[in-house]
């Protein structure tokens, strides 16, 4: 079968392309921007890519077109598919029909930590010899791809609440039919498609409706939004984490690089790993609980986590110049920003300065839904540098005025780099946060710092 994928260079759609190729299909695809590393990864799999959406790419017609959720009516290829009656399907629906239908699906949903927790579960299963399949919204550090078929019944998936396609506005995750469901947390996000928090809760309720009765739902009992969703109806077995739950963690050191696992008040495992931060400790606990549901002991799961390497862009050190470290993180929501800064502070101690650099790039950020929460979320930074994107209906200067620490902002990346370079001191740590490429600011900072004559 020849399958053509519209929007192929997104992490999820690229993962589907890899899976389709592994099934033996002839796979082609197109995207508005065909660029590494995804383009390189796909071409290495023998997948032919086209830049742009000229409808001639559909001549001769493929057997099936998988349409990404970034596509909309008016796209030349979408119009050609509809006009010529070419069979089409959404990515999540294809994944269900051709991959997940007969698998034991372990799904990780929630506002934060999906990629990390999914990667942890996949690595635990891999380390324990279970060779799982997976689709994850990033390349886990212990693997070299973001998706694979696997050689066992188990399939791990990052379960996103974003919509499936222009013709299917249901959340992606309702297609996945999980037997083991991890709910990390729940906050309002994706303001471009959800009117309010209740609309998000409704989709999570729909997800709970399709978990089998003998399946397992694992969730943190202290999360009030998830508690409300569970209260809307849950027909499956449950396990909870937190002070009143079955599962509990306890830090053995301040940065949470060592911690113990308790199950029903008994210590059942200890973890000592390369990650830091209480948010990662929480993610690790959820992964251990999920692994236990499929028969892996907490001790074996913890042993695997000791060797876990996170996906890129999760507090990733991009370089050190003249004693100044530049970190990169995917954080783009106030809760994630606060957690990342807290983790970095615990990692470097209380004496070194943190310079936080933020691009409000996500759709929710662009709409200004969370702008009033940004200043408090940045409180652990010693200085803040904000990028002002064009074409958003609010000004980052409003956030700057609400911050208690020194703040500078600019609408020009070069100017922003110059500001940071002028302010930096020996031993400082620069943390760049964005869910996009941020115009290559990380390398621009490293290049600028390399020419800097620091004055102590």
Model-derived segments and spans:
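ATP-dependent carboxylate-amine ligase
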Residues: 1-38, 43-49, 60-61, 65, ...
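Phosphate-binding loop of NTP-binding sites
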Residues: 19-23, 43, 56-60, 69, ...
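Beta-strand->loop->alpha-helix junctions that form or flank phosphate-binding loops
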Residues: 50-53, 91-96, 134-138, 233-254, ...
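Acidic-glycine-rich active-site phosphate/pyrophosphate-binding loop
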Residues: 251-269
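Fold-independent oxyanion-binding glycine-rich loops
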Residues: 8-9, 30-31, 52-53, 68-70, ...
């Amino acid at each position: 079968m020849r399958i053509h994928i519209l929007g192929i260079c997104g992490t999820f759609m690229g993962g589907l392309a890899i899976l389709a190729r592994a099934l033996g299909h002839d796979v082609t695809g197109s995207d508005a921007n065909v660029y590494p590393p995804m383009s390189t990864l796909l071409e290495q799999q023998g997948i032919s890519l086209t830049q742009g959406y000229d409808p001639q790419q559909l001549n001769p017609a493929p057997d099936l077109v998988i349409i990404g959720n970034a596509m909309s009516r008016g796209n030349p290829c979408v119009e050609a598919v509809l006009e010529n009656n070419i069979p089409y399907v959404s990515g999540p629906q294809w994944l269900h029909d051709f991959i997940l239908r007969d698998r034991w699906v372990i799904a990780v949903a929630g506002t934060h930590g999906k990629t990390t927790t999914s990667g942890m579960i996949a690595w635990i299963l891999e380390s324990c010899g279970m060779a799982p399949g997976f689709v994850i919204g990033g390349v886990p550090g212990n693997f070299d791809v973001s998706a694979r078929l696997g050689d066992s019944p188990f399939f791990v998936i990052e379960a996103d609440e974003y919509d499936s396609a222009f013709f299917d506005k249901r959340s992606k995750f309702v297609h996945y039919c999980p037997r083991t469901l991890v709910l990390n947390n729940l906050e309002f996000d994706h303001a471009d498609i959800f009117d309010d928090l209740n609309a998000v809760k409704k989709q999570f309720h729909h997800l709970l409706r399709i978990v089998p009765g003998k399946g397992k739902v694992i969730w943190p009992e202290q999360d009030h939004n998830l508690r409300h969703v569970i209260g809307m109806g849950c027909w499956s077995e449950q396990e909870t984490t937190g002070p009143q739950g079955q599962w509990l963690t306890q830090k053995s050191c301040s940065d949470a690089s060592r911690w113990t696992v308790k199950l029903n008040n008994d210590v059942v495992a200890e973890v000592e790993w390369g990650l830091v931060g209480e948010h990662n400790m929480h993610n690790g606990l959820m992964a251990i609980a999920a692994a236990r549901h499929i028969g892996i002991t907490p001790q074996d799961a913890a042993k695997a986590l000791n060797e876990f390497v996170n996906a890129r862009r999760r507090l990733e050190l991009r370089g050190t110049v003249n004693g100044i470290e530049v970190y990169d993180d995917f954080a783009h929501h106030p809760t994630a920003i606060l957690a990342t800064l807290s983790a970095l502070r615990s990692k470097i101690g209380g004496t070194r300065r943190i310079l936080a650099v933020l691009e409000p790039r996500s759709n929710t950020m662009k709409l200004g839904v969370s702008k009033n929460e940004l200043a408090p979320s940045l409180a652990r930074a010693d200085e803040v540098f904000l990028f002002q994107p064009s074409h958003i209906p609010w000004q980052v200067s409003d956030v700057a005025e609400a911050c208690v620490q020194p703040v500078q902002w600019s609408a020009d990346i070069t100017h922003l780099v110059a500001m940071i370079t002028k302010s930096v001191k020996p031993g400082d740590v620069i943390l760049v946060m964005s869910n996009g490429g941020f115009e290559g600011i990380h390398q621009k900072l490293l290049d600028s710092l390399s020419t800097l004559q620091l004055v102590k």
